[in-house]
Structures are given as C-alpha cells and as structure tokens.
C-alpha cells in the first residue's frame, strides 16, 4: 500500500522544496545559551531560542534538576491519577498558582497538551469559544476537539470581538481566548480591554502565557500583571519550556473548580505520563529564583529596548512593540532563508520564518532577545544584520 502513498509524498515534498518552504534542522552540539556550538564545530551567538531569561543552562537550575533526579528518580512510569503524583508535582502546582495569582494549577507534559485539553471538558454545544484569529496552533487544535460553537475575531480587533460577543449572547457560556503575546509578531494582547468586554458581556477569559510568564509585567507574572488585570483571568495556560527553564512541560492555572474538572476529564492529563521529576524540581527552583528578584526580567527589558532601537536605526522594518520577540520583516520566503544562512556565516544563529508558519508574503527573521545576552552579543548581531542586509539589498 505504501507504493501508492510514496509518490504522492515525494511530489508534495518536491513542491515544498521548490517553493522555498522546506524546513531543515540545524544540529546543536552544546547546551542552550547565548553562545552555542553547531555541528561541525562552529561557534555562534544564538538569537532564536525561547530562552528569554537565560535559565536553560543556569547552574542553579541544573543543580536542582540533578537533586530531583537523585531524590525522586528518572520517571514515574504512570499517569498522575494512578501512581504518578509525587510531592514535588503538588509543590510545583502550588508555586505556579502563587506566582500567577490564581487558585490552583494542573501540570501537563507540554503546553500543547494544556491547550489541547482545556476546552472539551468544560464546554459543549450550548457554549461558544471566541478566539483571536492568530492564536497558537495548540489553541486552534484544542477548539477543534470541542463541540462548542467557534467564533474567530480579527487579530487584536476589539470592535470585532464585541460583535462576536453580541452574536453569541444566547449561548450558555462564552469564553474569550487569546495569546498573551503572539509568537510571530511579539504583539501583546489588549487584555485590559478584553476583560472590560468580558465583564460587559458576561464572558470568561483565557490567555496562553507561553511567551510571557516570567518576564512580562513589573515582577514577571505575565500579561495580566502588565495590564493590571490580575484576578480577572479565569484560565491561564503556559509552558515550562520557554522563559521558565526551557525544558518541557505545560500547565493550566485558574479557578479552583475549573482545575478540578480538568483533573477529572482532560484527556491529555489523564492519558499522558506525568512530568519528569528532574523537570519538576528544576521548575520549582526557577519559580523560587523569579520570586526573589526581578534582575533577569529587568535585564531582558534593557536588552530588548537596546536591540529594537539599534535594529531600527540600521534601517530594518520591524514589528513595533516591547516584547523580546523582534520580527525583522523580509516578506519573501527565499530571501528569509538566504538571509538566515548568511547570518550563520557571520556567526549569528537566526531562523527565517515563512508560510505556513506565517501568512504568505510575510516572511521574516524572528529575533529573540535573552537576559543571557550581553551588549557585546547585541552589537555583533546588529553589525551582522547590517552587513547581510546591505549585501542582499534589504537596506541601503
């Protein structure tokens, strides 16, 4: 039977290749950090990791992971409700809830699972999910698994969101769903305005904080702190795989009864192995660090402001904002790939993003700033961008 599928796949892969959309993986042979080594021994500066706070290889985080490995083992060989819940899992759930200002938290193997498993247990045909059109793929897939009515509002458009709320007033429950920060643009959701509309139209609010937890807001609690609406968000999903250590694991945090129901009925939680003890222990250490000081968050903010200012002065078209995701717009997919390849030659590791990850004609280099970057790293990146940009005719 594969003889019939094989030529179809070969042709489709060839089409992807010819369109300049084929994705190739670069191999890294070192720990994650601002300075990394790629296969072949080349040392480069990394500007494309979600390592916002530089904690992926932080000595305290590694030490905590090793300690948990020794004290609680390598794995649990079980889902949570059978024999997969250790004291450190409950401790981490409590710490996340305290950090975010919520009532309770449930852990998942990945943030994709958190978003994939949140809607179906809570909503049915009588309800409506009103989602930003640029929400993460995991939210889109999670909504597809649910029988609730689906409404998409135009990206970051409060007028269109209000129209969708008016159109669904007959529904039993309605929930507004948005990314806290959108991963391709670095746009921060207007959560204050969303909460105002939610109160006006009696709707719930859910945010995915994967690109915010740990550094958005004055103390890094997230978008809800940034917009001064802590306590008004019903569901917060997020990841341990970006700013909060960078390994893997996800969570859903929010109202007590919501979390209780997810423990009973959320399929990714019920049918996936528990989070590894080493990740759990390391994540506890991360939250302790971030609760004690905002030094890393503050440095990230300084680095981001500096890079955004300098890359703009160099003549590049970037998406405006304050987030450490800095999209350098190139528009053409093949140009984005060539640009990224030449940047690697200059010792700067960045990736070109293009369709289907971003819309057709919106190809870009997505730069991601880290607290682990020093000014020397940032200046080298600006110099490389300028050199390559001039060589390829992107800037004058």
Could you describe each region identified by the protein language model?
Residues 51, 151, 155-207:
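Active-site phosphate-binding strand-loop segment of PLP-dependent enzymes
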Residues 63-111:
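Conserved N-terminal alpha-helix of the aminotransferase class I/II PLP-enzyme fold
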Residues 201-204, 211, 216-322, 335:
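Active-site C-terminal subdomain of aminotransferase-like
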Residues 59, 63-67, 71, 94, ...:
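PLP-dependent enzyme catalytic core of the Aspartate aminotransferase-like
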Residues 298-307, 312-347, 357, 362, ...:
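Conserved PLP-binding catalytic core of the aspartate aminotransferase-like
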Residues 118-137:
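Conserved PLP-anchoring active-site segment centered on the Schiff-base-forming lysine
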Residues 101, 125, 145-147, 201, ...:
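Short, structured coil segments at secondary-structure junctions
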Residues 10-11, 15-72, 203:
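N-terminal "arm"/small-domain region of PLP-dependent enzymes with the aminotransferase-like
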């Amino acid at each position: 039977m594969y003889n019939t599928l094989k030529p179809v796949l070969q042709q489709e892969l060839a089409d992807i290749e010819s369109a300049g959309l084929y994705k190739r993986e670069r191999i890294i042979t070192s720990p994650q950090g601002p300075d990394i080594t790629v296969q072949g021994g080349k040392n480069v500066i990394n500007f494309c990791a979600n390592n916002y706070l530089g904690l992926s290889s932080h000595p305290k985080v590694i030490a905590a992971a090793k300690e948990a490995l020794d004290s609680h083992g390598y794995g649990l060989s079980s889902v949570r409700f059978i024999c997969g819940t250790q004291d450190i899992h409950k401790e981490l759930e409590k710490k996340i809830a305290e950090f975010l200002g919520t009532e309770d938290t449930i852990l998942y193997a990945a943030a994709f699972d958190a978003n994939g498993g949140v809607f179906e247990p809570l909503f049915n045909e009588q309800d409506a999910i009103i989602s930003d059109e640029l929400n993460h793929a995991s939210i889109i897939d999670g909504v597809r698994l649910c029988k609730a009515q689906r409404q998409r509002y135009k990206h970051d458009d409060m007028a269109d969101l209000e129209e969708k709320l008016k159109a669904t007033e007959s529904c039993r429950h309605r929930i507004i769903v948005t990314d806290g920060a959108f991963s391709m643009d670095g746009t921060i959701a207007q959560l204050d305005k969303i909460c105002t509309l939610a109160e006006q139209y009696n709707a719930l609010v859910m945010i995915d904080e994967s690109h915010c937890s740990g550094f958005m807001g004055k103390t890094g609690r997230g978008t809800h702190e940034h917009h001064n609406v802590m306590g008004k968000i019903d569901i917060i999903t997020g990841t341990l795989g970006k700013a909060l250590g960078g390994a893997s694991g996800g969570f859903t945090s929010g109202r007590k009864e919501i979390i209780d129901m997810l423990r009973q009925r959320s399929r990714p939680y019920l049918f996936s192995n528990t989070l590894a003890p080493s990740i759990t222990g390391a994540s506890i250490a991360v939250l302790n660090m971030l609760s004690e000081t905002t030094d890393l968050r503050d440095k990230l903010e300084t680095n981001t402001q500096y890079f955004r200012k300098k890359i703009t002065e160099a003549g590049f078209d970037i998406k405006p904002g304050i987030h450490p995701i800095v999209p350098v717009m190139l528009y053409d997919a093949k140009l984005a790939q060539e640009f990224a390849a030449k940047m690697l030659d200059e010792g700067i590791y960045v990736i070109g993003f293009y369709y289907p990850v971003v819309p057709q004609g919106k190809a870009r280099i997505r730069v991601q700033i880290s607290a682990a970057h020093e000014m020397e790293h940032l200046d080298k990146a600006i110099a490389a961008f300028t050199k390559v940009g001039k060589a390829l005719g992107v800037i004058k």
